[in-house]
Amino acid sequence: MTIKGDEMRVTRFVSATKLRRFLAGMFLVIIHHSSFIIPPAAAAEYPARPIRWVMPYPAGGSFDTVSRALAQRLGERLGQQVVVDNRTGAGGTVGAEIGAKSPPDGYTIVAGGEGTLVVSPILRKNLPYDPTKDFSPITQLASINYILFAHPSVPFRTVSELIAMAKAKPGQLNYASGGTGSAPHMLAELFKYRTGTNIQHVSYKGSSPAINDVLGGHVQLMFTGLPSILAQLQAGKLRGIAVTSRERLASVPDVPTFIESGVKNFEASPWYGALAPAHTPRPVVERLYREFAAVLKEAPIREFLTRGGVEPVGSTPAEFAAHIRHELKEWREVISRAGIRAD
């Protein structure tokens, strides 16, 4: 009996020791992941300090212009400043990586579009982030109507004249883009594929320096979001060739669409949205979505966006996540058929 009693005491001691070790381990796990959990009181107080909005694109571009207008109103609604932080490079992937690897505490937002979330993940090997795993989508903010424009000195004024010249002088025309995998790059390659033309790509570190070189007459063509060059178009410093929308735009009524210019199935509106690092607490993501959606419904904001050829969206986090997955599938097929490569 004494032996059995000792065995029982030993068994209880071992079991208690294992339980303590298990509970200690669970405590460490909870502490490690505590940044993913926001108590109700803390969630109600969010945000308690300024929020950084990582912008993978240069200042002055379409996404940057739209984001700064939204950031001001978002900050006013949240009661904290929203600071746009331009972190450019590698077609936007530098800023996207910074956003993906930031603490998931609700104080980092990252802008993302087709280039960083769809095209670069398809074209580039060893990308330092996964668009479907390393972000918590907040909302698709907008779709931006793009325009093909040229320096006023070019000898063509219409899409048909451009195609004729490109076919007569293959490889002698060139177009600028804000980097490999960017929306301007993909649209130009899609145009070449659909029209059977050979136009050389000149890649820049962002859309702003690319636009400047078209303004200077160093490069002949470029696709970009309309807000980036609307003032230069209206001043006659640049020439609009065609817009990618279904119908003509009120802000540039004399510029035809690609469809009416004879290029069928060429309707495209590059999009972009707001995301947070993966594992950002769900209540924070939902709060940011509600505030963004409210800002996008405000009449002055909608007027500012639509005047520049930007269509407000404001989709839910789930809808935006599904949209990213759909775009990955669609663009993977287009890139494969067109033979587009990272150059």
Whereabouts are the PLM-identified features?
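Short, basic, low-complexity termini and linkers enriched in Ser/Thr/Gly/Pro
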Residues: 1-18, 29-39
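Sec-dependent N-terminal signal peptides
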Residues: 21-29, 342
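N-terminal (or domain-start) structured segment
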Residues: 43-133, 172-174, 180, 196-223, ...
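An extracytoplasmic/periplasmic, membrane-proximal ligand-sensing/linker region
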Residues: 48-50, 193, 260, 282-343
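Hinge/capping helix and adjacent helix->loop/strand transition within the periplasmic-binding protein
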Residues: 101-107, 122-209, 258, 271-304
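A ligand-binding cleft/hinge motif common to bilobed small-molecule-binding domains
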Residues: 116-126, 190-194, 221-255, 332
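C-terminal lobe and pocket-closing loops
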Residues: 157, 229-297, 329
